[in-house]
Structure formats: C-alpha cells, structure tokens
Amino acid sequence: MNISEGTVSVSRLVYLLKEVVEDNFVQVLVTGEIANFSAPSSGHYYFAVKDDQAQLRGVMFRSSNRLLKFTPENGMQVLCGGRVSLYPQRGELQLVVDRMEPLGVGSWQLAFEKLKTKLDAEGLFEVGRKRRLPSFPRTIGVVTSPTGAAIHDILNVLRRRGAGLHVLLSPVRVQGDGAADEIARAIADFNRHGQADVLIVGRGGGSPEDLWAFNEEVVARAVFASRIPVISAVGHEVDVTISDLVADLRAPTPSAAAELVVQGRQELERHVDHLVMRLSGQMQGRLSLLKERLDGLRRRLRSPVDDLRRQYRDLEQLRKRLFSAMEKTMQRAANRLGLAGSRLHALSPLATLDRGYAIVFSAKTSTIVRDARTLTPGDRVQIRFAKGSVEATVDEVDHGD
C-alpha cells in the first residue's frame, strides 16, 4: 500500500491532540462520581470521575490535595475543578484536579466559582484598591437583620469598648428571596447620605444556602462601589463569601468586626496608657532624687553647732601648728644670727684693738698707715685705740730695715 504524504506519526498526532485539548480546556468544572480511587505513598490521588455514560481518568497532586478538608472515597459525588490534559504515553485524557468539593454543595459551589472568576477578572478582589479603616470613627453603619444575633454581638462589643460611638442600623433580610437586593440598597443608602464612617455588613452563621445572599453579584458590586470602607462579617471563620473577598476588610465574626472598628481607639488608649506609665515612672524617679537631696540638706541643718565646733577645733589645731612652726623658725634664725655675730666679731678690727693693738691713720689722707716709710718727720697722724684716739706728730721714722 502507498503511504500518503499527508500521513502523520502516532506521536505527532497525539501531541497535536494534546495541544488542542490543553489549550481549550484550561479550566473546567466537572461533576461526577469518584471511582477507582487510590492514594499511593507519593501523596498524589489517582481516580476516575464518571457518570452513567462516560468516565475520565483524574489525578490530584499532593500540593493540591493537602488543602482538602475531606478524603475522597469511591462512590462519592464531587465537583472537581481543574484542567484537561492528554497523557501521550497511553494516549489517554485525564483531568488534572486542583480543587474538589463534595457534590452536596456542588451547585452552590459552581455558581460561587463562576462569579468569583468573573469578579476576579474585573479586579474587584485586588488588594491594592482596599482601603484602611478610619482610626477614630464616630458613626458605625450596620447592615444586618434587626433580630439576629449579629447586631446584639456588635452592640455588646461597641458598648464595652467604644464609648461615644454612634451606631446606625439599616435593617435588612439576610437570607431568602430579595435579601441580596435589600443589602445592596442599604449599602448604597449609607453612601448616598454619608451617614457613617465605616460599614459592617454581615450576619451570623448558617448553612451555605443561608449565607448565599452575600455571594450574590448585586451585593458584591455594592460593596465594591461603596465610598465608605466596608467590613464583611458573614457567618463563622470557616465561611468565605464573595462579599468577604470584595470588602476592604474581612472579619471572621460580627463580634470581631466590632473589635476591628474600635482597634484604632484601643491602640491609642494603650499608647496613652504607656506614655502615662512612662511619665509616672520618670516623675517618681525625679521625686525620689529630690527627696534624697532634701534629706541630705535636713541632716546637714540638723547639727550646725557641731559643724562649727568641728571647724573651730580644726582652726585651733592649725593655729597651734602655725605658732609652733613660727617659734621654731625664729629660734633657728636667732641661732644662725648669733653664730654669724660671733664670727663677725672675731674678724672685726675692734677685737684686735681690744688685744692692745692700735690703728694709725694719716691726718693728711685719712688712710691707714701700713708702712712707716710712707711717713716723714713732722707728719701728723691719728692713732685709734680700742677706746678713744689721739693725734701725734712724727718725730722720727724707723724704717725697720
């Protein structure tokens, strides 16, 4: 047989089919019954999803199935979300599942996922557009049932923690036909009249059907359009609604929403309390220091006479030491002066005269005559003795040669 030029290999055909399938079934939601379920040691789940007329092999990798709140079982009706892939080695289609829910809430979940995908694509869930709550709101708008537990929980918290806050309730139905429209109108009315600084929109817990009004598109768009920051407080912590995703802030319960409203006020009060404690501590420390100084001054003022007596004794001791030093100094000076006088007297000419010697002065020049050859007969001289003097005339000169 002739091989046509238009033929393709098996692998080529399979990979062409793989591209077609994976490009066109990127995200699908499939309902069916679990069959042939297995969970090997790898941690991945392998199974088939079937109905009365067909079945599709499925896989849920460990990174996805660890988030499940239940374990799939054979015969369980489920809603699977994921993508369709083609396994080339066996030429088999398979559903790569990234999320799974029991089919008991499947129809609700399907609607939830469709709206969630739509609004997410429009940017209603973007974190960047969400606003901060006012730190010190004065008026709180509440959109909920006037008879439910939610409003009582909110009021109890605000009374206990938010002294001076005003609460405006817009009573609405929170479940059943028309509830979503009432909730959306209440949010719009608060914005139209500018009556509140922050809105709490929510209700107490219930079944998925009971909470469904907060998954309606009309409520989501009203929350998104609100110029007033919105806190969504629907059901319990495990319940997540479309309103939670759109709101500026999600609270797990209505009571928690009220706590968030007064959080800024509480933080300010804690900050003020901290400052007061610091100031009180500093004042106590300062007062203690001043008290110590005052006690010291009191102790010093308590015995001024003792201080004066002590100072007088010190002064008297200094005076005695000074006079003693002066006497010793004067005595040493007197001794040195007496010794010097004795030495001076021994060297004085008068001492020599006392021993019988005399000094001859020339009457003409008033100088001492040390050599007889300087005199001639007839010269007048003055002779000085130890006591007194005489004048004489030289009669004869003996040169003493």
Curated annotation (Swiss-Prot):
Entry keywords, A to Z: Cytoplasm, Exonuclease, Hydrolase, Nuclease
Assembly information from the UniProt record: Heterooligomer composed of large and small subunits.
Keyword hit for rRNA-binding: no
GO biological process: DNA catabolic process
Keyword Hydrolase: yes
Gene Ontology terms: cellular component: cytoplasm; exodeoxyribonuclease VII complex
An MF annotation (GO) of this entry: exodeoxyribonuclease VII activity
Cell compartment(s), UniProt: Cytoplasm
Location (main, coarse): cytoplasm
Catalysed conversion reaction: Exonucleolytic cleavage in either 5'- to 3'- or 3'- to 5'-direction to yield nucleoside 5'-phosphates
UniProt similarity note: Belongs to the XseA family.
PANTHER family reported in the protein's UniProt record: EXODEOXYRIBONUCLEASE 7 LARGE SUBUNIT
Entry protein name: Exodeoxyribonuclease 7 large subunit
Function according to Swiss-Prot or TrEMBL: Bidirectionally degrades single-stranded DNA into large acid-insoluble oligonucleotides, which are then degraded further into small acid-soluble oligonucleotides.
HAMAP family referenced in this protein's UniProt entry, alphabetically: Exonuc_7_L
Pfam families in the cross-refs: Exonuc_VII_L, tRNA_anti_2
Gene field: xseA
E.C. no: 3.1.11.6
InterPro entries: Exonuc_VII_L, Exonuc_VII_lsu_C, OB-fold_nuc-bd_dom
